[in-house]
Design a protein with these regions (language model features):
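Extracellular/oxidizing-compartment recognition motifs
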Residues: 1-229, 262-263
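Active-site acid/base region of carbohydrate-active enzymes
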Residues: 191, 198-218, 224-225, 231-248, ...
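Solenoid-like repeat scaffolds
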Residues: 273, 408-412, 441-449, 477-483
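Conserved small-residue packing positions in alpha-helical repeats and bundles
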Residues: 295, 367, 423, 458-459
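Short beta-alpha connecting loops at secondary-structure transitions
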Residues: 299, 339-349, 404-408, 439-446, ...
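Non-catalytic C-terminal accessory modules of carbohydrate-active enzymes
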Residues: 472-607
C-alpha cells in the first residue's frame, strides 16, 4: 500500500502472478489490466493471495512505480517496508528464480582412470554438469574437490547415477574434478556451466610479493563462490548459513563488494522469526554474532530502516540468550546448546570466558540498536558493565597476562580465543591488550589456531595491536601454504603438519574437509583494513580514515569499496603515499599527521 500523487490522468497496470485485487481510492479493481486513474492524490492498496512463491507485484506507470516507498502487512500487525531488489526490473522477471549468471567452462584436462574418465576443470566451482549420452547406457558421475575424491567413489561425498536420456543437465554441485563412467558409449560434450551471483569485485590489492596477490585473488574467488542467495559456509558442504561463518563474510564483503543486499538477506535468513526455541544454528556464540553483526552492518552502511524493521526479532533473540544464562549471569550450556567458539582444545568444563566476552559485546550492540530505534539502551550498558566486572574477577589472570578458558574446573587453561575476543572488541585497556599480545598471542607455547575461521580473528587482534608484519607473515605461511599445495579456493581447515590426502579428511570422513570455505576469505578484510588502512570513523562512512601501513612490503597498491558506489585507492612506497577517493569525509593518517583527503583528485604526501 501507499499514497501518491499524479499530475494528470494516468494508466496503471498492476502485474502479478498471484490471485489479487487492487483498491484505488476505495474502488476495487482487477490486476493485470489497464486502469485509468485521474489526476490528484490517491491511496492504493493491493491484496494478494500467494499460495506458492513470493507475493509480489510490478507497476511501471508515469506516476506510480513499484519501489522501496511501499509498505506491506500480512493483514495483522503494523506495516513494514516492502522488499525490493534491482535484480528484478521487468514484469517478466520472477522473484522465485534467483538471478544467477552462467558461464560455460570446458575441461582443461581429461585422463583415463580405472574409475572412468577424469575431467579437470582447472579450479573449484559450483556448476551444472551437462553431457550427451546413449539413452540405453547407465552413467555414473563422481564429484571431487580433489582428483583423489573424484576417483574414489566409495569415499566421495557426492555421486550421481543417471540413465534413460540422450542429454543430461545435472543438479548444480561443487567440484573441480568429475569422474564419469558409462556401461555403454562414452558420454560426449562434457561441459560445466559455472553458476554464480554476478557481484562486482570493487577492490584490489598488490604489493612487491607476487604470492600475496595470488593469495588475495584466491580469497576473493572463495568469497565469490560462497556468495549466493545468502553467504554460505562452503559450496560442497554444508552449503548452509552458519552465523559465525557469515559474520566474517559480512566483514570481507565490505572490503570486496560492499554489497549490502547479500548481508541483509543473510541476516534475515538467520534470524528467522520468534519465538526462539534454540540458538541460531544451535550455537550460543552464533546467536551473539548475529546481533553483533547486525549492529556492525548498520555502522558500515547507515541503513537505519533495516534495523527498525528487524529490531523486534533482534530483541527477541537477545531475550532468548538472556533467559538461558545461569545464576552467575553467564552464558552457559543448556540442553540443546552447542558451545562452539572454535575447533580447538578449549576447556569447556564450565562457563567459558570467550562466550562471556561475546555476551558483553552483544549487550553493547543491543544498547546501540535500541537507541537507534528510539528506545532506552541504558539497561543494556549497565548489564554489560556488571558482566565485565564479573569476567575480570573470575577469568583474568594478571600474572599470566591473559584470560583462562574456564574458572570452575581448576585447570586454569589459557587458550588464544577469549584473549583474541578481548582485544577485538576493546574489552580490555590498551595496556592489558599489549600484555595479552605479548604473553598469549606471541607465545608459541599457547596452542595454535588450526582453522582459517579463528585465525582470522587472531589476525584482526594482531592488526589492531599494530603487529602488521606478523599478520602479513601468517597470511603468506597459512593461506599461502594452501595455495602452494595447489588450492584454487581456501579450505575449511589447514594443518601444515599434514601431508597428501590427510588434508582432505575431517569429521571422520576421508574427504570431509571442505576445500572451499567462506571463512577462508579473511585476507580480503585484513589487507584492506590494516594494510591499505581504510575504515569508517562514523556511521555509514560519513567520515572515514585511510591509515596505510606497508608492514614488510616494499610497496602496496590497492582499492577499497565505499558505500553507494564510492571507492578509495591507496598507493604507497617507502617515500610517498598517494590516495584517491570519490567520497567526501576521508582523512589520511600518516606518520602521526592527519590530512583531509580531497574528492576526485590524487592526493600525495611525501614522508
Amino acid at each position: 500500500a501507499k499514497a501518491y500523487h499524479s499530475d494528470e490522468e494516468d494508466t496503471v497496470r498492476v502485474v502479478t502472478r498471484h490471485k489479487a485485487y487492487v483498491t484505488i481510492d476505495n474502488r476495487r479493481l482487477p490486476v493485470n489490466q489497464d486502469i485509468t486513474v485521474p489526476a490528484g492524490d490517491h491511496a492504493i492498496r493491493i491484496v494478494i493471495l500467494a499460495q506458492e512463491g513470493f507475493p509480489c507485484i510490478y507497476i511501471n506507470s508515469k506516476y506510480l512505480v513499484t519501489d522501496g516507498t511501499w509498505v506491506c502487512d500480512h493483514l495483522a500487525g503494523g506495516p513494514v517496508p516492502v522488499g525490493t531488489w534491482d535484480a528484478y526490473t521487468s514484469p517478466e522477471d520472477d522473484p522465485t528464480v534467483f538471478p544467477f549468471a552462467y558461464e560455460t567452462i570446458h575441461p582443461v584436462k581429461v585422463v583415463n582412470t580405472d574409475e572412468g574418465k577424469l575431467y579437470d576443470f582447472g579450479r573449484e566451482m559450483f556448476s551444472v554438469v551437462r553431457f550427451d549420452a546413449d539413452p540405453a547406457a547407465t552413467v555414473r558421475v563422481v564429484y571431487g574437490e580433489s582428483k583423489e575424491e573424484a576417483t574414489e567413489p566409495a569415499e566421495a561425498l557426492i555421486r550421481e547415477t543417471v540413465t534413460g536420456k540422450a542429454h543430461y543437465d545435472l543438479v548444480p554441485r561443487a567440484f573441480r574434478y568429475i569422474c564419469v563412467k558409462s556401461d555403454g558409449a562414452e558420454p560426449a560434450n562434457v561441459i560445466a556451466d559455472y553458476e554464480y551471483l554476478p557481484l562486482e569485485d570493487r577492490a584490489s590489492f598488490s604489493c612487491n610479493r607476487r604470492d600475496v596477490k595470488k593469495i588475495w585473488d584466491i580469497c576473493a574467488y572463495t568469497l565469490h563462490l560462497n556468495s549466493r542467495e545468502f553467504f554460505l559456509d562452503g559450496i560442497k558442504r554444508d552449503r548452509w548459513c552458519w552465523s559465525g561463518d557469515a559474520y566474517q563474510s559480512y566483514k570481507a564483503n565490505n572490503y570486496l563488494f560492499f554489497d549490502p543486499e547479500i548481508t541483509k538477506r543473510t541476516i534475515v535468513a538467520l534470524l528467522g522469526k520468534p519465538p526462539y526455541e534454540q540458538h541460531i544454528n544451535t550455537i550460543n556464540d552464533y546467536s551473539m554474532y548475529l546481533i553483533i553483526g547486525a549492529y556492525e552492518y548498520y555502522y558500515a552502511t547507515g541503513d537505519k530502516e533495516f534495523i527498525q524493521v528487524y529490531y523486534p526479532r533482534l530483541k527477541a533473540l537477545y531475550d532468548f540468550i538472556e533467559g538461558r544464562t545461569n545464576e552467575a549471569g553467564y552464558v552457559c550450556q543448556r540442553p540443546g546448546d552447542w558451545i562452539f567458539i572454535d575447533w580447538s582444545d578449549i576447556d569447556k568444563g564450565g562457563d567459558l570466558c570467550a562466550e562471556q566476552i561475546l555476551f558483553w559485546q552483544c549487550r553493547n550492540a543491543m544498547a546501540s540498536l535500541s537507541e537507534l530505534v528510539g528506545l532506552d539502551g541504558d539497561s543494556y550498558r549497565k548489564a554489560a558493565e556488571k558482566l565485565k566486572r564479573n569476567i575480570m574477577r573470575d577469568f583474568w589472570r594478571e600474572d599470566r597476562g591473559g584470560f583462562v578458558d574456564c574458572y570452575t574446573t581448576g585447570r586454569e587453561h589459557i587458550t588464544r580465543h577469549a584473549n583474541i575476543c578481548a582485544i577485538m572488541y576493546d574489552f580490555v585497556t590498551e595496556k592489558r591488550a599489549r600484555k595479552i599480545t605479548r604473553m598469549v598471542l606471541e607465545n608459541d607455547e599457547i596452542t595454535q589456531i588450526t582453522t582459517p575461521y579463528f585465525e582470522f580473528f587472531e589476525l584482526c587482534a594482531l592488526g589492531k595491536m599494530g603487529k602488521l608484519t606478523a599478520v602479513q607473515k601468517k597470511i603468506e605461511s597459512y593461506w599461502g601454504g594452501m595455495v602452494k599445495l595447489g588450492a584454487t579456493s581456501i579450505w575449511e581447515q589447514y594443518l601444515p603438519e599434514q601431508v597428501g590426502i590427510q588434508h582432505y579428511g575431517m569429521y571422520g570422513m576421508k574427504y570431509g574437509c571442505s576445500l572451499c570455505h567462506a571463512w577462508g576469505g579473511g585476507p580480503i578484510y585484513l589487507l584492506g583494513r590494516y594494510c591499505l588502512g581504510v575504515y569508517p570513523t562514523s556511521v555509514g562512512y560519513e567520515t572515514y580514515a585511510v591509515e596505510p601501513n606497508r608492514g614488510m612490503y616494499k610497496h602496496i597498491d590497492g582499492k577499497v569499496p565505499l558505500p553507494e558506489g564510492g571507492e578509495v585507492t591507496v598507493k604507497m612506497d617507502g617515500h610517498t603515499c598517494t590516495v584517491y577517493t570519490t567520497r567526501a569525509g576521508g582523512t589520511l593518517i600518516l606518520k602521526g599527521k592527519e590530512y583531509a583527503i580531497p574528492v576526485g583528485e590524487a592526493f600525495t604526501v611525501e614522508y
